[in-house]
């Protein structure tokens, strides 16, 4: 089941009782998981860059996996990057990678080797890629 996005779902489920939404979402996801249903949820966040919250609802504890996608500026161009933040019970890649949406699907690109601070909103261009000699 796909919930795209949590903010629209919140308006439908708890239009007058927003404080009940988190509990309602928890109960629904737990019931669906018991039935063997996979739930994919998207959440659009304001880019504050100062905090790396992954949901305005405090619902990250419900998830088995979190993938963050973000636009960044690189050399006066907007680029898309993604990173796997969480995969429950799994050793996953912690790399930040560029990606493109093409006519044939999503193309995962290169690691962002020469930059730091990408997800925090203050990217810094480093002189060389990690592990390289000057």
For every predicted segment, state its role.
Residues 1-66, 74-76:
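P-loop NTPase motor core
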Residues 65, 69-134:
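Conserved P-loop NTPase
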């Amino acid at each position: 089941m796909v919930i795209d996005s949590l903010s629209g779902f919140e308006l439908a489920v708890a239009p007058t009782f927003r404080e009940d939404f988190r509990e309602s979402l928890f109960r629904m996801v737990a019931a669906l998981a018991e039935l063997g249903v996979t739930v994919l949820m998207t959440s659009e966040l304001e880019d504050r860059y100062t905090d790396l919250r992954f949901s305005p609802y405090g619902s990250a504890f419900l998830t088995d996996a979190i993938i963050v996608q973000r636009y960044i500026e690189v050399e006066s161009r907007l680029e898309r990057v993604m990173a796997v933040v969480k995969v429950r019970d799994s050793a996953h890649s912690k790399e930040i990678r560029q990606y493109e949406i093409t006519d044939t699907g999503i193309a995962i690109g290169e690691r962002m080797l020469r930059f730091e601070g990408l997800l925090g909103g203050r990217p810094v261009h480093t002189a060389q890629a990690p592990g390289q000699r000057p």
